[in-house]
UniProtKB/Swiss-Prot annotation:
It comes from Arabidopsis thaliana (Mouse-ear cress). Its main location: membrane. One of its GO terms (cellular component) is plant-type vacuole membrane. Involved in inflorescence stems gravitropism, by modulating vacuolar membrane (VMs) dynamics in gravity-sensing cells (e.g. endodermal cells) during the amyloplast sedimentation process. This is Protein SHOOT GRAVITROPISM 6. Expressed in roots (e.g. root cap of primary roots and vascular tissues), hypocotyls, cotyledons (including in guard cells), stems (e.g. epidermis, endodermis, phloem, developing metaxylem and interfascicular cells). The keyword Signal does not apply. Keywords: Membrane, Repeat, Vacuole.
Length: 1716
């Protein structure tokens, strides 16, 4: 009875009404929740949901804002109705509402209209006749309603074809009469409907083949509709109407009678074809309709085809261009749509071909013959597609197809060529390629495989690129070779296949030679390789080649392929393919070649195998060309057949027509002919061929010109005189032509360019002739060449490439002289200095040079010129001083060139260094002059060695080091002009060269004196570079110093005359060399350590005189533009003074000090100046300093008050002095004690203190008096600049310093909170410096991170962090610091007490070993928990709970008592600290200490769980969970009651907005689980839903938990009461959680008392919340709760409830009050 009573009293209709009303809520979350609940309810009581939806829908869209949602719910509810559950009257009302809404607007596709249509379709599944009647009513109504009604019928047909199709007659009877009045804008809807209806009929017929729905009436309607659509709509002016009509007609053609179809064809076909003319986007739709039409007309089983082929020609002619449209879509539109259109067109042609194969074949061939690109392209594509499918029908037509394809071979359209190429491949696969025509087709593929983008074949509007065409042809050619032979051949076409093989071989050999096929050589070679590989075991290839006279001879093939090897990086692995073919064709050549190639070809293929690796070698092209020339030369050598060599030469000579002059292959061809002529003994033949080479060469192209010159050089190796004769003829003919002379009068550019090219070519040819000519015969030729004025004529060239050629030629002449000297034919080069002037002239840039000349070319010219200068300087006679200076003036400036482009600049700089070394080696007559020459060069380089630009310093140091290396070899063992090491024929010994003329002179004439080297000046110049920022500069400069001292010690009696100990000097030099060895082997070594060792070694190697000279010259070094180098110079000076200062006289010390002071004045960098002052302090170490100490401190105080010390140029000198004092052993201790005493007896000034009137700095410090201010600055300086000595003094007073700074930090933060920031900044600076001084880097980071935070929590935490850091790093200091701070708790200043408490609360953690101090600290902390400052109270409490665990056991009861008292503190921050501390204490406290006050703690924690502070709530929940382990004795029962009272609160906060609260509740629930007797709680709390942050998972967990909780019926009452209280929580998400928890328990509870007591209360609350709450999350929870309660109600009475008229009317007036 109770259940029935409850069921009858459930206000289900009201709840459903609220849910329906919520469909118009502003929040999407609420709308979705309401929709989900209504779906659940609709599955149980769909009629109630429909009643409520019906109630709100009667007002329409004007009264309800989300009619789309209402219609969606209604559609689902109707779908949930069981058969017979609803009456047709009510469904009729719903249908009327839906139709009324649909027709109320002229819109046709709004969201609410679509949902209303869905409702009608759902109604139609139950009452199709009712739905159709409703629609039929409006079909005859206003014209605006009919389209929507027709669309609904179309949707119904698509969704339920089996019910719709039997009623098609009625639909057509209603729709047909109104078709004539349908407006154009609505006709697409009607046409689409007929399409859907036709599809439904086809589906019905497919599923139910026994009964046909197409009776005579239906056919009559369909025929009449078909006629209307065809005659009227298909010719409408509206494009959309025509498109939709054709789409519909395409579906209807299979339903109408054959008679009507035949009569309709004359109109229907043009209507479809008309679509192709307007918009290409409609091609797919039109083609699909056309395919349906063709199937119905041609392939019908009811009779013969309705269309003759003549009738189809217009159709087929229209379809052919569509293939091109598809090709266009591949670029500009959707690829899938284009591909579908293409396939539909092919299906149309296949349909026709199945009926009229021969006619279609003839039609397609005729279209090809028209040679109209779109038609031809389409026809070729169709032929390619249909040839395999209609092969048997078309087999007899093969000659016609071959002839037609042959006629298209000259077509220019790339698209047609591509289609024809594809067709050729298909024809080949079906054995169409036979006889001469087959060769034509193969040649066609080869020719188009050679097409390149540069051929300009892609005309405007072309859709196919040359690249695409080339790819298709290349693949097709390979397919003919590889794939087709693998196909299974029938007996019928086996002979045809053999003919195809005969066509390919040896016909493909003809494709190698012609120029037009050059781009296809790789593909051809690959095909030849495959053919040779497959046929190697059958017919001998040699016989087949010789059997055909049109095949090129072997010499022509060999010469062509060798030249084509030029590019190793060519596409398709051209070089490797050619080498493979040569290997297969080796039987065609002389016998010995085959064996040689077996070894050589694999090596060459291995070189070009990895092209990516090949690219890494910048000289790969030159290397590869040399390999080709060597390959050719050795091939010629092994043949030993002079006639064959002559024949090969003739073949090479004929190939010039195959290559353009600017093609690099032409240059290689020159060289090939040159190496071949080198092997020929017939001088007349050689003369004829070099004339031919020169005639064919285009010397205006640098590459061609260079190839010609190298070829002439190769010929000169065997025929020098013949080559020189040719060159003389060329020289004599330069400018002698009458035509040229006349032309030059009118065109200066013609004269210049033509002359430049000829002179450049001549110069190169002379140069390479000298290079390759025998050394024994070149002296006279070179003398004759130099002795004439021919070289001077070459200076007038202006093009950079021409200049480079002339320079290269001069360089080759010089190298020829050097090479001759290597073979023993030594002779001087006449007019060498004049030739140097020529090079310098060519190297300079002409002021009139045009902008067309690239700067890169100028740099390349200069690099070549430097190289040539080096060559000329290295030959006899010796270089004069004037020439030397002229060369250096013209070249040294290159050191200042920028780094980019590096590939050009780097070789240029290397050539310059080599030139300087060559100048040094070839200059001077004795030791002194050579040393002076060295110093002259080095001083010229000083500006670059000390340059501020990194790469200039590196270049300068490299140059210095290279020259020193050369100089050392020169002094010790002579030199070689070519730089050879060891004994060589051109080495010149100093002693041997001097013996003849200077045997009686002192050794100074043979060896330089050490003083001449000026080591002091040189050392201080290069020493800063040893500390350079560039590692390479450091390494090189160290080697420079090593070379200097190695040279000095290698000189005769160098050590004895210097006053140094010989053994110590060599030890120092050995140490320096060890450092250099380390630098070379280990780049990670500390640079400062390396520099120290270098300075130490040098200090021992310098003589007294050199030391003084270095100190006197140190100003420039200390002022070096590189900071690190300047620091190194200062360090070196300090080392020199410290170690060898006793050797300095008073005058020397004075001058050295003057140099250091001068440097310090010029140094603006503060740190560098401090280091300079440190160097001065090292000189004054033995002077008195006590008076200076007092005066500096007083002066500093005055400066602080009266000056802006932060803006003094170069920094504050007094601070630098502080640094200097702090670094003295005796002064540092006294200085620190004095500063600490001032800090302890002084206090910070108030905010009204200020500086003098002259103060202008905004960052001035505010301290009590001048002395205190100076002391703080001095203390900071002491910490920062004291070094090891200062650090020792600080360590001695560590605890005093920390205590004072900590207390002052509290005072400064107090001042900062009132707006006075400066004292805090000054103190933090000093504190930071202290951290750096004592090495507490972590403490320094803490200060830097949080030091300036003025919030109390931040600075209190800062002091705690500092205390913790000190405790870890320096535990021995903790006791003394704690004693100082414990006493400070009694100070009257609040901020100092807070600072002391903050520090002690952290220090106490590390004071367990100090029992007496611990007792004193605990007593003080307990006493001050009643301090006036809340901060002191909570910090004291925090300190108490942080004492070591060993000590805590003695004070646990006392600490817990303090916590219990502070849980009721009036300050919330103290309460929060108390809760946090309780958590900490419970980790180790015993039961005896906690159990007596367990319930008191629980009650207070429950009160704190409703705090607005999320941290407080989280900690309160966690603390209560932590107390659960103490509920073991008499307090267990009381604590369990506390748990049950708290459990609902834990559950609703389990999905709190704050993540910390969520985690705390999870942990606490797990701890409570053993006490509340939940079965299988481990499975519940270990589930994924319990730990998830997703709300859905939370709701799932609540459902699972509720299943366990409702089993204890006596507790459910308590849970429900507590949960309902949470309905009024201040947090919306907690309200939502409480709603869900309570409704879940109610839905699962079996206790009728609980249900009867709380069900109405909760339901009423949900209604109230739903209508009044402003929070969407609450309204969404209410919506879900309604669904949950109604879906799970134990009573089924409400499931039959309906919404009565009175209630619905009343509720309808209340809907406006619902929150939206």
């Amino acid at each position: 009875m109770a259940s029935s009573s409850l069921g009858s009293s459930i206000p289900a209709p009201e709840a459903v009404q609220l849910l329906v009303s919520s469909l118009a809520d502003d929040s999407s979350v609420v709308r979705e929740a309401s929709m989900a609940s209504l779906r659940d309810i609709a599955s149980l009581n769909p009629l109630l949901v429909l009643d409520c939806c019906y109630a709100v829908s009667r007002g329409g869209r004007r009264r309800f804002g989300n009619m789309a949602g209402v219609f969606q719910v209604m559609a689902f509810s109707v779908g949930a109705l069981e058969k017979g559950e609803s009456d047709s009257v009510f469904m009729g009302k719903l249908a009327k509402i839906a139709t009324a809404e649909i027709i109320s607007s002229k819109e046709l596709n709004a969201d609410w209209q679509r949902q209303a249509s869905g409702l009608l379709v759902s109604i139609g599944t139950h009452f199709p006749d009712l739905m159709m009647e409703e629609i039929f009513l409006h079909l005859s109504g206003p014209a605006t309603a009919a389209p929507a009604m027709v669309q609904i019928l179309a949707d119904f047909a698509s969704s339920d074809a089996l019910q719709f199709t039997p009623r098609l007659k009625g639909v057509l009877s209603k729709v047909s009469p109104i078709l004539g009045n349908v407006r154009d804008i609505h006709r697409p809807i009607f046409a689409n409907a007929f399409k859907c209806w036709s599809q439904a009929v086809w589906l019905y017929i497919t599923d139910l083949t026994s009964d046909s729905p197409l009776d005579s009436d239906v056919m009559s309607f369909l025929n009449s509709v078909f006629e209307l659509l065809l005659r009227v709509w298909a010719v409408s002016r509206d494009h959309k109407v025509r498109v939709s009509t054709v789409d519909a007609l395409g579906q209807m053609v299979g339903l109408i009678t054959r008679t009507q179809l035949k009569s309709a064809l004359p109109r229907l076909i043009p209507a479809i074809l008309e679509l192709y003319k307007k918009d290409h986007d409609d091609a797919l739709l039109a083609t699909c309709s056309l395919h349906n039409l063709l199937n119905a007309s041609l392939l019908s089983e009811s009779g013969p085809p309705l269309l003759d082929f003549e009738d189809l020609t217009i159709v087929l002619s229209t379809l052919l261009p569509v293939i091109g449209i598809n090709n266009e879509r591949k670029r500009f539109s959707d690829i899938s749509v284009g591909r579908k259109t293409y396939n539909e067109v092919q299906r149309c042609f296949l349909t026709v071909g199945l009926v009229y194969p021969e006619d279609l074949f003839t039609f397609l061939l005729n279209k090809c013959k028209l040679k109209e690109d779109p038609l031809t392209f389409g026809a070729l594509c169709i032929l390619k597609h249909l040839l395999p499918r209609l092969f048997e029908a078309w087999h007899s037509k093969r000659p016609l197809l071959v002839d037609t394809a042959s006629s298209l071979l000259d077509e220019q359209s790339l698209a047609v060529r591509k289609a024809l190429s594809e067709l050729i491949v298909v024809m080949a696969s079906h054995c169409y390629l036979v006889g001469p025509s087959g060769e034509l087709f193969v040649e066609y593929l080869v020719r188009h495989s050679a097409i390149g983008e540069s051929d300009h074949l892609k005309a405007k509007g072309e859709l196919v690129s040359p690249t695409q065409l080339r790819a298709v042809c290349g693949k097709g050619l390979l397919l003919l070779t590889v794939t087709i032979p693998e196909m299974e051949l029938s007996d019928f076409n086996a002979k045809e296949y053999m003919k195809l093989q005969y066509i390919l071989w040896p016909f493909l050999l003809k494709m190698i030679i012609p120029k037009v096929y050059t781009g296809a050589v790789a593909s051809v070679c690959r095909c030849i390789t495959e053919l040779c590989r497959r046929r190697s075991s059958t017919t001998p290839m040699l016989i087949e080649c010789k059997a055909r006279a049109d095949i090129p001879n072997p010499e022509e093939l060999f010469t062509r392929l060798v030249v084509l090897l030029h590019n190793p990086l060519a596409k398709e692995q051209l070089a490797s393919q050619i080498l493979t073919v040569l290997g297969y064709l080796s039987p065609l050549f002389p016998k010995n070649i085959s064996m040689f190639w077996q070894d050589e070809i694999p090596k060459m293929k291995a070189y070009v195998y990895d092209t990516e690796d090949l690219k890494l070698d910048p000289t790969y092209q030159e290397t590869w060309d040399d390999m080709i020339i060597n390959f050719l030369a050795e091939s010629l050598d092994v043949t030993q057949d002079a006639d064959w060599v002559i024949s090969l030469g003739n073949s090479f000579a004929k190939q010039y027509i195959l290559y353009a002059p600017d093609d690099d292959h032409a240059a290689l061809l020159h060289r090939c002919i040159g190496i071949l002529l080198q092997k020929v003994n017939d001088r007349a033949y050689v003369r004829d061929k070099i004339d031919w080479m020169y005639e064919q060469a285009d010397i205006s192209i640098p590459a061609n010109r260079l190839g010609l010159a190298k070829a002439m050089g190769l010929v000169a190796a065997s025929h020098l005189d013949t080559v020189l004769e040719k060159l003389k003829i060329i020289v004599d003919n330069v400018g002698q032509s009458i035509f040229q002379r006349i032309l030059s009068l009118f065109s200066e550019s013609y004269k210049t360019e033509d002359s430049d090219d000829i002179h450049a070519a001549l110069a190169l040819m002379y140069g390479y002739a000298a290079k390759y000519a025998p050394s024994s015969v070149i002296e006279a030729r070179i003398d004759a060449l130099v002795g004439t004025n021919m070289l001077s004529r070459l200076l007038h060239v202006r093009q950079q490439t021409a200049k480079q050629a002339v320079i290269t030629a001069i360089d080759l002449l010089g190298r020829a002289v050097i090479n001759a000297a290597e073979t023993g034919a030594t002779f001087p080069l006449k007019r060498r200095d004049q030739m140097l002037d020529y090079i310098l002239t060519l190297m300079g840039r002409d002021e009139n040079e045009g902008f067309a000349e690239s700067s890169l070319e100028v740099l390349h010219t200069q690099a070549l010129a430097l190289n040539a200068c080096t060559t000329l300087v290295s030959v006899e006679p010796k270089l004069t001083i004037e020439t030397r200076n002229r060369v250096m003036k013209a070249t040294l400036g290159f050191f200042a060139l920028p780094n980019d482009p590096s590939d050009v600049i780097s070789p240029l700089i290397d050539n310059l260094v080599t030139l300087l070394c060559a100048i040094l080696l070839t200059s001077g007559e004795d030791g002194r002059s050579r040393a002076e020459q060295l110093l002259h060069l080095l001083r010229q380089l000083d500006q670059y060695v000390s340059s501020p630009i990194d790469y200039q310093r590196k270049r300068g140091c490299v140059a210095v080091h290279e020259m020193l290396l050369k100089f050392r070899k020169l002094c010790v063992g002579g030199y070689c002009a070519l730089g050879c090491s060891g004994d060589c024929p051109h080495r010149k010994y100093a002693d041997r060269s001097m013996q003849g003329n200077f045997s009686n002179l002192p050794s100074v004439f043979l060896f330089p004196d050490r003083e001449v080297l000026c080591l002091g000046d040189r050392v201080i110049t290069y020493l800063p570079r040893c500390a350079d920022t560039n590692s390479e500069v450091r390494k090189i400069s160290a080697q420079i110093l090593d070379q200097f001292f190695s040279i000095s010690l290698s000189l005769p009696k160098a050590v004895l005359t210097s006053g140094l100990d010989s053994e110590d000097s060599y030890k120092a030099l050995s140490s320096l060399e060890d450092v250099i060895a380390i630098l070379k082997s280990d780049a990670s070594i500390d640079p400062s350590e390396v520099f120290n060792r270098i300075v130490s070694s040098i200090c021992s190697l310098l003589t007294e005189h050199e030391l003084v000279a270095a100190l006197h010259s140190c100003t420039a070094a200390i002022c070096d533009k590189i900071r690190q180098s300047a620091e190194g110079a200062i360090q070196a000076v300090t080392e020199f003074v410290s170690r060898r200062g006793s050797q300095l006289s008073d005058n020397d010390i004075s001058r050295t000090t003057h140099s250091l002071l001068s440097a310090a004045v010029h140094i603006t960098d503060k740190n560098l100046r401090v280091e300079a002052i440190g160097a001065i302090s090292a000189l004054a170490e033995n002077t008195q300093s006590s008076i200076v100490f007092n005066e500096v401190l007083a002066t500093a105080g005055k400066d602080i008050v009266t000056k802006d010390i932060t803006r003094m140029r170069g920094g504050w000198p007094m601070q630098d002095a502080f640094y200097a004092f702090s670094q003295h052993t005796e002064l540092s201790v006294l200085f620190m004690e004095h500063l600490i005493s001032i800090l302890n007896r002084s206090s910070l000034v108030k905010s009204d203190s200020h500086k003098g009137e002259n103060t202008s700095s905004s960052s001035e410090t505010h301290v009590e008096d001048d002395i205190l201010q100076a002391a703080i600055f001095a203390l900071t300086a002491f910490f920062r600049g004291g070094g090891k000595i200062g650090k020792k003094a600080v360590e001695k007073s560590y605890s005093s310093v920390v205590g004072a700074l900590t207390l002052q930090l509290g005072s400064c933060h107090g001042l900062a909170s009132s707006g006075q920031q400066d004292p805090l900044r000054v103190l933090l600076t000093s504190f930071q410096a202290f951290c750096e001084c004592v090495g507490d880097l972590e403490m320094g980071k803490i200060l830097a991170r949080n030091g300036e935070q003025i919030e109390k929590e931040k600075w209190v935490g800062l002091i705690g962090d500092i205390a913790g850091c000190i405790s870890i790093k320096r535990p021995k200091e903790v006791r003394h610091i704690c004693m100082i701070l414990t006493k400070a708790l009694n100070r009257p200043q609040r901020f100092q007490r807070e600072a002391a408490a903050a520090a002690l609360s952290e220090f106490i953690r590390y004071s367990g070993d100090f029992s007496s101090v611990m007792e004193e600290m605990v007593e003080a902390l307990c006493r001050h928990v009643s301090d006036d400052s809340p901060t002191v109270r909570r910090l004291c409490l925090r300190g108490l709970v942080q004492m070591p665990s060993a000590c805590m056991s003695h004070y646990t009861t006392q600490v817990i008592g303090v916590i219990l008292a502070l849980l009721d503190d009036l300050d919330e921050s103290v309460q929060l600290t108390a809760v946090s501390c309780l958590l900490m204490v419970t980790e180790s406290a015993s039961n005896d200490a906690v159990e007596p006050i367990l319930l008191n703690l629980s009650v207070r924690l429950r009160n704190l769980q409703v705090s607005m502070d999320p941290k407080m709530r989280a900690n309160a929940f966690s603390a209560l969970g932590a107390l659960s382990k103490y509920a073991t004795g008499g307090q267990r029962e009381g604590f369990v009651e506390q748990i049950h009272s708290t459990l609902p609160r834990l559950v609703v906060h389990l999905h709190d907005d704050d993540p910390s609260i969520r985690q705390a509740c999870r942990v606490t629930l797990k701890r409570f689980a053993p006490l509340v007797d939940i079965i299988n709680y481990s499975t519940l709390y270990d589930s994924r839903a319990f730990g998830s942050e997703d709300r859905t998972d939370y709701e799932n967990f609540v459902r699972d938990l509720s299943k366990h909780l409702v089993q204890e019926s006596e507790r459910v009452d308590t849970y429900m009461a507590s949960t309902i209280q949470a309905f009024d929580a201040p947090w919306p998400v907690i309200q939502a959680n409480a709603i869900h928890f309570s409704t879940t328990m109610l839905s699962l509870s079996e206790d009728q008392h609980i249900i009867s007591l709380y069900y109405p209360q909760v339901f009423e609350t949900l209604v109230s919340k739903m209508t009044r709450s402003q929070d969407s999350v609450v309204r969404a929870a209410c919506s879900s709760a309604f669904g949950l309660l109604l879906r799970s109600s134990k009573s089924t009475l409400w499931r039959g409830a309906r919404l009565d008229g009175t209630d619905s009317g009343r509720k309808a007036n209340d809907l406006e009050s619902v929150k939206k």
